[in-house]
Amino acid sequence: MTKNFIVTLKKNTPDVEAKKFLDSVHHAGGSIVHKFDIIKGYTIKVPDVLHLNKLKEKHNDVIENVEEDKEVHTN
């Protein structure tokens, strides 16, 4: 089941490393849903959590945070 995740890269991540991460997303059968302009971050769609875990392992040195993209509600 495909899921969307918000991935934030570390501030000092060089553009070439960010490109490698994005290439890996596509290689894993995923896609880029949205690119954030203010922060170095992306919403990605991946086939399953296994693919996400492989991306996290491969690019652990540049990934700051990963969270599932879902609705947020306030009280």
Curated annotation (Swiss-Prot):
Please verify whether the record's keywords include Magnesium: no
Mind telling me which GO cellular component terms the entry cites?
Answer: cytoplasm; nucleus
> InterPro entries annotated for this entry?
PBI_I9, S8pro/Inhibitor_I9_sf
GO molecular function terms noted in the UniProt entry: serine-type endopeptidase inhibitor activity
Which GO BP terms, alphabetically? protein transport; vacuole fusion, non-autophagic
Q: Which residues carry this modification: Phosphothreonine?
A: 74
Where is the protein situated, by its record's location annotation? Cytoplasm; Nucleus
Question: Keywords for this entry?
Answer: Cytoplasm, Nucleus, Phosphoprotein, Protease inhibitor, Protein transport, Serine protease inhibitor, Transport
Q: Family per UniProt? A: Belongs to the protease inhibitor I9 family.
Physiological role:
Cytosolic inhibitor of vacuolar proteinase B (yscB), probably regulating protease B activity during limited proteolysis. PBI2 is a component of the LMA1 complex, which is involved in the facilitation of vesicle fusion such as homotypic vacuole and ER-derived COPII vesicle fusion with the Golgi.
Miscellaneous comment: Originally, 2 inhibitors of protease B, inhibitor I(B)2 and inhibitor I(B)1, have been isolated from commercial baker's yeast, which consists of both S.cerevisiae and S.carlsbergensis. It has been shown that S.cerevisiae only produces inhibitor 2, and S.carlsbergensis only produces inhibitor 1. A sequence for inhibitor 2 can be found in strain S288c (AC P0CT04).
What do we know about how this protein assembles, alone or with others? Part of the heterodimeric LMA1 complex together with the thioredoxin II/TRX2. LMA1 binds to the ATPase SEC18.
Name used for this protein in its record: Protease B inhibitor 1
Which species does the entry assign this protein to? Saccharomyces cerevisiae (Baker's yeast)
